[in-house]
From Swiss-Prot:
Species name: Thermomicrobium roseum (strain ATCC 27502 / DSM 5159 / P-2)
Record-given protein name: Phosphopantetheine adenylyltransferase
Subunit (UniProt): Homohexamer.
Pathway membership, UniProt: Cofactor biosynthesis; coenzyme A biosynthesis; CoA from (R)-pantothenate: step 4/5
Function (record text): Reversibly transfers an adenylyl group from ATP to 4'-phosphopantetheine, yielding dephospho-CoA (dPCoA) and pyrophosphate.
Keyword annotations of the record: ATP-binding, Coenzyme A biosynthesis, Cytoplasm, Magnesium, Nucleotide-binding, Nucleotidyltransferase, Transferase
Keyword Nucleotide-binding found: yes
InterPro entries, per database record: Cyt_trans-like, PPAT, Rossmann-like_a/b/a_fold
Reactions catalysed, as given in the entry: (R)-4'-phosphopantetheine + ATP + H(+) = 3'-dephospho-CoA + diphosphate
């Protein structure tokens, strides 16, 4: 039996912390699907990058991992996990502050899909302070992103904010 997992998230943008979790999850499972969530219509918080841009950035960051695929999905993560045959959903934990939310989310997933387990991986300590929101703020203000995101993501952020300033 092949063990599949889904690592869902907005990934707006993918960070080195995300890449770290993906690399480690890819060692634990036969196949890992990184699910880029695209269902933001009507929500107050809109992503900076489109779903297809986020997919492209993630694919470039993860192309060295042969057992990882990047998809775009909308709807419930547990429904998508079932649709792709995943037995587990991977979640990354940066700090104790993430735990309460992830704990509640895991119980909701369990309620909705008892057949899908949740596996939480602690981020490596050098990435424990990184969040996509923080990365976007640093990029917008012209800060140094070295070591925080893959180089191509840093370049995409610079270009995106240049474009937004022109508009």
């Amino acid at each position: 039996m092949s063990h599949r997992a889904l690592y869902p998230g907005t990934f707006d943008p993918i960070t080195n912390g995300h890449v770290d979790v993906v690399q480690r999850a890819a060692r634990l499972f036969d196949f890992l699907i990184v699910g880029i969530y695209a269902g933001h219509e009507g929500r107050a918080k809109q992503p900076l990058f489109s779903a297809e841009e986020r997919r492209f950035l993630a694919e470039q960051a993860l192309r060295h991992l042969p057992n990882v695929r990047v998809d775009v999905f909308s709807g419930l993560a547990v429904d998508y996990a079932r649709a792709v045959g995943a037995q587990a959903i991977v979640r990354g934990l940066r700090a104790v502050s993430d735990f309460e939310y992830e704990f509640s989310l895991a119980h909701m997933y369990r309620h909705l899909a008892p057949d899908v387990d949740v596996v939480c991986l602690m981020t490596s300590s050098q990435y424990s302070f990184i969040s996509s929101s923080m990365i976007k703020e640093v990029a917008q203000l012209g800060g140094n992103l070295t070591g925080l995101v893959p180089d191509h993501v840093a370049e995409a952020l610079v270009q995106k904010f240049r474009t937004l300033v022109r508009e």
